[in-house]
Design a protein with these regions (language model features):
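Contiguous beta-strand/loop segments that form the cofactor/metal-binding neighborhood of enzyme cores
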Residues: 106, 110-122, 284, 312, ...
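Predominantly a Rossmann-like dinucleotide-binding segment in NAD(P)-dependent oxidoreductases
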Residues: 37, 47-65, 81, 256-258, ...
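Glycine- and charged-residue-rich phosphate/anionic-cofactor binding loop of Rossmann-like
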Residues: 55-102, 167-168, 404-405, 423-440
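Glycine-rich cofactor phosphate-binding loops and adjacent beta1-alpha1 units
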Residues: 1-40, 201-206, 211-215
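Rossmann-fold NAD(P)-binding glycine/threonine-rich loop
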Residues: 6, 20-38, 42, 48, ...
């Protein structure tokens, strides 16, 4: 409060107080009222900071709208330094070899330094692979390279692979640090900041792509062209052009190269039980995803990066319905919520028509209550009904010898990765037929 008060005392009438950094904001009205002062909090580098459209997509603010943007601030400072009007050299207190970094960071308050420079060795070689050394592999098949070290990879994929006793040779991430941390946790042999090291290693049999959605297609194609089998988290791709390129890469890959998409729900014991009980023939399927609200600024809504939640998430249930139907989608239509729904809507009802006469309705809603089950599937067939409640309980009506099945929540991830690891080591048919993957992706 005192800092703001002093600033108001110093300011002229109708002046502006700009806060750079963090101080308490317990302000007094009188400090601003008498002089009609304005108060502004400055973003760290200037307007545009934390704005995805500005920072990563290059959409600048008009000059008349914002004079000093993040980019213009940097440009002005760099120009001032290059012209000599701003002297920063005199601020440099010391230069220290990287090996002696503790001289700077030991006790910064006592040091009295204004600015310090860390000097890297002139002959140092940039390495994109770091050996973790916890697991030296023996000869044999089944080695895996993972591209992507995000939350889902860490929380779900790595534990499932560990239970399957999978051999992870690489974990890659763009920055490298997250890959190294996760590699230590997973017992992987290497961490890398360049996924090309995975693609070019002849010992790697399976490449797992777990990055943001817009990178899936490119990395799948590169892996296939390098003769690697691929597992990619859903979705396979974001548009038909990418899908056509994937088809060509798959058809041109060496014999025995497989492509699997992370449609894990079909591998749940609940889904497999439903498929056995229902058998063949036409069915009516109603699948509801109470997906929950995600703020609009989150990347999954960005059509160029995430593809929207229908492409990015609802594809799970299109594959599940296809698995339960035992047939391929031949027609699709969709109605979205609202008078003028957005292209990246996350409130929609999807109607699927299958070749064997099955009808499926998928309700993907983001406007429901968190207290209601996230996922529910109902199937009607031959005077029988199956109801799956949130992957915890399956109830049957009209079935001889079956009434219900209960277990802990199981969406099929564990079985999916166990089977995948077995296939990579021992060979066998693809987990999901390529034609089924294509059909689901086209329908999505």
């Amino acid at each position: 409060h005192e800092v703001i008060h002093q600033a108001s005392e110093m300011s002229r009438k109708r002046g502006r107080i700009v806060l750079v950094g963090v101080v308490g904001l317990n302000m007094r009205r009188d400090d601003f009222y008498k002089k009609e002062l304005s108060f502004q909090v400055s973003c760290s580098y200037g307007a545009g900071r934390y704005d995805e459209e500005y920072e990563n997509k290059g959409h600048d603010y008009p000059l008349a709208y914002v004079r000093w943007t993040e980019k213009r601030n940097f440009e002005t400072i760099l120009h001032a330094i290059s012209s000599g009007s701003l002297d920063v050299k005199s601020l440099i207190t010391e230069e220290v070899d990287l090996a002696d970094y503790e001289e700077i960071y030991g006790d910064m308050r006592k040091k009295g330094s204004i600015a310090s420079i860390l000097r890297f060795p002139a002959d140092s070689k940039m390495e994109s692979v770091v050996s973790i050394g916890s697991n030296a592999f023996v000869s044999g098949n089944g080695k895996i390279g993972i591209i992507g070290a995000g939350n889902y990879t860490s929380a779900m994929i790595i534990p499932c692979l560990a239970k399957a006793h999978a051999r992870i040779k690489y974990i890659a991430s763009a920055q490298g640090l997250s890959a190294k941390i996760l590699a230590r946790k997973a017992g992987a042999e290497n961490a890398t900041s360049d996924y090309q090291n995975i693609l070019k290693d002849p010992e790697v049999d399976l490449v797992m792509v777990t990055t943001r959605h817009n990178l899936h297609a490119r990395m799948v194609i590169e892996a296939l062209r390098n003769g690697k089998s691929v597992f990619v988290e859903k979705p396979l791709c974001l548009n038909e052009t990418e899908l056509d390129d994937i088809i060509r890469a798959y058809q041109g890959a060496p014999e025995g190269t497989t492509l699997t998409v992370g449609f894990n729900r079909r591998f749940s014991p609940f889904a497999e039980k439903m498929r056995r009980l229902l058998g063949d023939g036409p069915k009516n399927i109603v699948a509801t995803m109470n997906a929950g609200f995600i703020p609009r600024e989150v990347w999954v809504h960005d059509l160029e990066i995430g593809g929207g939640r229908i492409i990015g998430e609802a594809c799970h249930f299109i594959d599940l319905c296809s698995f339960l139907a035992g047939s391929e989608v031949v027609a699709v239509c969709m109605n979205a919520l609202g008078e003028n729904p957005e292209e990246n809507t996350d409130n929609a009802s999807i109607l699927l028509r299958y070749a064997n006469g099955t009808n499926a309705v998928i309700n993907y809603f983001a406007n429901g209550s968190k207290s209601y089950a996230k996922e529910r599937v109902e199937v009607f067939s031959q005077e029988r009904v199956l109801v799956l409640d949130n992957w915890r309980k399956l109830t049957g009506y009209g079935f001889k010898g079956f009434s219900s099945m209960k277990a802990g929540m199981d969406k099929g991830q564990k079985r999916q990765f166990t089977l995948l690891n077995e296939r990579i080591r021992e060979g066998g048919e693809p987990l999901i037929p390529f034609e089924s993957i294509l059909n689901t992706t086209k329908a999505t």
